[in-house]
Amino acid sequence: MIVGTVKEIKNHEYRVGLTPESVHELTAHGHAVLVETGAGEGIGAHDALYERAGATIIATAAEVFARAEMIVKVKEPQAVERAMLRPGQILYTYLHLAPDPEQTRDLIASGATCIAYETVTDASGGLPLLKPMSQVAGRMSIQAGATALEKAHGGRGVLLGGVPGVLPAKVVVIGGGVVGFNAAQMAAGLGADVTILDRNPEVLEKLGMYFEARAKTRFSNRANLAECVAEADLVIGAVLIPGAAAPKLVSADMLKTMKKGAVLVDVAIDQGGCFETSHATTHAEPTYIIDGIVHYCVANMPGAVARTSTYALNNVTLPHALRIAELGWKDALRRDPHLLAGLNVWDGKVTYKAVADDLGLPYTPAEDAIA
């Protein structure tokens, strides 16, 4: 198969779909790999490294799209990239379609076969292609929140871990999954006063056993959430419903109960955000203030630590890419129901139910694509 990767063009996105090591694996299995010139510069991988791994360097993204049978990316294709997709071409990347009707319409119109990293599952029901970026984003959310709490950035002027004789910041993490766990781990490690909210008693039990006295856990209901948010210096939104738009758990009215200069970090912004007042921001302009509350809603947080993120991502995406290239997408999906769960759009149809439901579009079961 001819596999292609291009330079990411989303604002301040420095990751790349394939590392030179991944290219070497693909070419060693007999596949041709096309790499847009400069695609790996953000992780310190220059064209010569890709050439040594067996790739052919291509001058433009347009030529890569025109020649490749499968495009491997990191972030959802931007409008100019979507216009280059063609019927039957495979797109393998993060998509986050539920809150993005425009992208969904374009992918439907393209006729491409679109496999989303974030909905591929594993035997335990986890999301293995989302997990490493969730780990990165969870940890980064605390770094970003700590910076936003500084007075110069509009925050309360509170040090996350405090100092002897001065109380630490109160950090509230909404959601105890991969993002929430990593955020809580970082915040607790810095000495913050951490509370984690979740609706799953088993998750709360596991978190309680892990953190012991270093973090508190509370069941997530309206009353507990409102109380915790009102007391917080920093709130991390770490809620995920696989493939679906995130629920709006913190309302605009709740902001009025918060301390002025408190910070909201919405890690769920890729799926539309879990705060009513959230809208996507960029690394160039990461924050805005509503009712005195600082909002950090960068939609590609791991892009800021591109090298770590790219290698962590390739560790989990490459095996599936190899399988698709070796077998073709239909056979690969027939043999692996977990990879089949990643199929979001095929032949002009939405094949992931949560996306179809959220956008009010007709739903075609993914199984129809491999029948």
Predicted regions and their residues:
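Glycine-rich phosphate/diphosphate-binding loop of Rossmann-like nucleotide-binding domains
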Residues: V6-A45, A152-G237, T287
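Glycine/serine-rich phosphate-binding loop and adjoining beta1-alpha1 elements at the start
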Residues: I2, E8, A79-A169, V298-N300
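General beta-strand structural signal in soluble alpha/beta enzymes
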Residues: T5, L34-T37, I57-A59, K73, ...
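Rossmann-like adenosine-cofactor binding region
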Residues: M209-D291
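Adenosine-phosphate binding glycine-rich loop
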Residues: E118-L159, I269, C274-A371
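An N-terminal-biased, well-structured beta-alpha scaffold segment characteristic
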Residues: I2-S110
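Short glycine-/small-residue-rich Rossmann-like dinucleotide-binding loops
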Residues: E69, K75-E76, L95-H96, N221, ...
